[in-house]
């Protein structure tokens, strides 16, 4: 333990000095990187039962996270629970108004904003109720008894929120296996957060992706029709969700909720088609707004969106065929905005 404490201290000094240049200016990424994590607990198993697993945490993390959350009840968390709960929490952090996010296998399957947190949950769940079953649910505000009553009416694996009323906690006890996590207060961080991904023999180290609100500070409208204020609001919601969906990502939204999510397809037009398929049995895609995490390389994605009843699109822009894509949008009286920022997620 003594060596461990000393090594952590030395690592902190090394990392700090590593980002200082000769002129004392700072470079975000050091030449040598030393990471220090402490084992929180062993897991029943890893991603699959034949794999061993443990959860290691950064004790210095101040950002609200699954790592510094408190488990109020339920079975022990699995590796997949932690991974999905992290994705769910990071997505719900994107929203300032009351919001609910439901995640299944590391992809959002339903997201909604509403003045009523209960209605936000119902709207998110009903986007794709089949996928929501057995999923992870996160809220960005206090869970009261009405929400708790709705939660225990179905099966979910993990519930995440910054706080719970005493009545809600009592109601949730009706599902003793439900893992209930309370996070620290969700507030904007001033930390310089970094993102780490592992590959065999190394790690990839980068800035954490930016918040989605910043992308809408400046945007261009290349189409003949400009989006309405309502469309802009809906496009922003879709964009926030799209940033947290595995690429290629397409999100359809309407009335402050997602209506169809096309995740993880190997080409963009299939993601558009999948989002439409997902919407068919529930909310439908008519009069929806579409977000795409990267540019459309061809007009086929726009043509498919038109068939789905999409009225407005947000995308980064920047394709060599942008003019072709803009023409397709104009032919279908769609409004389209270019934000100039891509949000790939792998």
Regions found by a protein language model. Name each.
Residues 9-13, 19-346:
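ATP-dependent carboxylate/acyl-activation modules
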